[in-house]
Amino acid sequence: MSRVSTAPSGKPTAAHALLSRLRDHGVGKVFGVVGREAASILFDEVEGIDFVLTRHEFTAGVAADVLARITGRPQACWATLGPGMTNLSTGIATSVLDRSPVIALAAQSESHDIFPNDTHQCLDSVAIVAPMSKYAVELQRPHEITDLVDSAVNAAMTEPVGPSFISLPVDLLGSSEGIDTTVPNPPANTPAKPVGVVADGWQKAADQAAALLAEAKHPVLVVGAAAIRSGAVPAIRALAERLNIPVITTYIAKGVLPVGHELNYGAVTGYMDGILNFPALQTMFAPVDLVLTVGYDYAEDLRPSMWQKGIEKKTVRISPTVNPIPRVYRPDVDVVTDVLAFVEHFETATASFGAKQRHDIEPLRARIAEFLADPETYEDGMRVHQVIDSMNTVMEEAAEPGEGTIVSDIGFFRHYGVLFARADQPFGFLTSAGCSSFGYGIPAAIGAQMARPDQPTFLIAGDGGFHSNSSDLETIARLNLPIVTVVVNNDTNGLIELYQNIGHHRSHDPAVKFGGVDFVALAEANGVDATRATNREELLAALRKGAELGRPFLIEVPVNYDFQPGGFGALSI
């Protein structure tokens, strides 16, 4: 039952005003870990907004990030002062580079005792967070909290979307000065979708792009997450289908076209040539003469050098932000506007155009299919492509058409996920594309399952990243989230071992090798049912059991990697 937090005077406090305004903006959950500010805020002051206790503040930040990403609405996370805030800061960094509208909140020392680096647990929170946020401020007077929340939301929902931060001195949080709950809050006016820059004359630039398309023989659309945030996916699909233009995506934009669509040319990772032992980037881009980057974001790690294969190309940039990277990407035409507005205009501008001739990538598709069908039984552990193929199979069985989410933590296996994991809806494949935050998997799966409670969520994580944040297995169990987790275990930081071999032609075990962890026992100790699988048959059976269980389930899979360091020439070191 909700109640109004009151000061000793019996009047409502800033804590109530804070939660009330967050709720006005559509925030339904606050993920976090509470400290001594619990004397000022209980988090039951307002109905319709729930506190979700996590074991680590990083989990709180990433869970809010993913819930915000999928819903398109700002979400909130909380930390106590000092080390709580610094723990949360990696979640904040994740949301700034991964582009999610997160409202990060942290307690601060009493307003009369804020002496950073001298007062117990007192750090200059705003100075720490400001460089990696859209907006960072400290509350000075209790009655200003509503305005600060409004400013935080507006900044977070401005492209490129990202986190806003409010530091809350505990005495002001518990103060009633100027707080009047008898007066209704003004309308929140939360943006319906992120707000970007609209350049004067963008329509003329769009028409120039259409003229380039008219001359092109083999164009492609390279689509990033800003296109999804704009609500442009159906329009992009219609445009691509009408003009027969292939669609290539960044990691996080997988699912713009569903698996199996003839125009879905896949997602790009710089590791793909090495993983496949095949000239994948050359196959995807060499014949292309026009690249239209639609909602493209350099942070999503599809670098211009990757599409600059083969013949000389013209480029068109369509983005709701001014180009931040002219040194590495200088397009022939730059259209700065809302992505959906551009696609709608472009439909009219190209209405008389005939279908284009798609370039052939069948050799690449055949190579990917060969990996997914790999029937071998390996004595030293399954191969990651076999694991992902099994996950794809059971996801297709368990999910309704166009549904389901595969979450990937960070590691070498993540790039197998980019290549091989199915994604039948926007944000159907989730990973930390911008920040690559180690340990992302568990909190991202929590956020995804909460955003899509009626859809299955599968998580793939390596032993390194998973165990760096495995304490929040208990959070999954406590919330009874039916997440099916697959831990691919080689007792190694496998991606770092790859880089050792690329740079030195050998590995150095003390820097990458771990002692063994019994992840089945670890899961069970946290209240999660678990098993171990060593081959396809066992893994498929375990995945099907997990998908039908209706509660959390973990599968540990011993794996090994086969790689030739010389095949990873597309990587920048």
Curated annotation (Swiss-Prot):
Keyword Magnesium attached: yes
Catalytic reactions on record: D-glyceraldehyde 3-phosphate + L-arginine = N(2)-(2-carboxyethyl)-L-arginine + phosphate + H(+)
GO biological process, one term: L-valine biosynthetic process
Enzyme class: transferase
Cofactor note: Binds 1 Mg(2+) ion per subunit. Binds 1 thiamine pyrophosphate per subunit.
Taxonomic superkingdom: Bacteria
Listed cofactors: Mg(2+); thiamine diphosphate
Assigned GO CC terms: acetolactate synthase complex
Residues the entry annotates as binding Mg(2+): D463, N490, T492
Transmembrane region(s): none
PROSITE patterns: TPP_ENZYMES
Family matches, as InterPro entries: DHS-like_NAD/FAD-binding_dom (IPR029035), THDP-binding (IPR029061), Thiamin_PyroP_enz_cen_dom (IPR012000), Thiamin_PyroP_enz_TPP-bd_dom (IPR012001), TPP-bd_CS (IPR000399), TPP_enz (IPR045229), TPP_enzyme_TPP-bd (IPR011766)
Enzyme nomenclature, EC number: 2.5.1.66
Binding residues annotated for thiamine diphosphate, in chain numbering: 410-413, 436-438, 464-465, 490-495, 561
Similarity comment text for this entry: Belongs to the TPP enzyme family.
Quaternary structure annotation from Swiss-Prot or TrEMBL: Homotetramer; dimer of dimers.
Role of this protein: Involved in the biosynthesis of the beta-lactamase inhibitor, clavulanic acid. Catalyzes the thiamine diphosphate (ThDP) dependent condensation of D-glyceraldehyde-3-phosphate (D-G3P) with L-arginine to yield the beta-amino acid, N2-(2-carboxyethyl)arginine (CEA) via a beta-elimination resulting in the formation of an enol which undergoes a second elimination to generate the alpha,beta-unsaturated acryloyl-ThDP.
Name by which UniProt lists this protein: N(2)-(2-carboxyethyl)arginine synthase
Gene name as annotated: ceaS
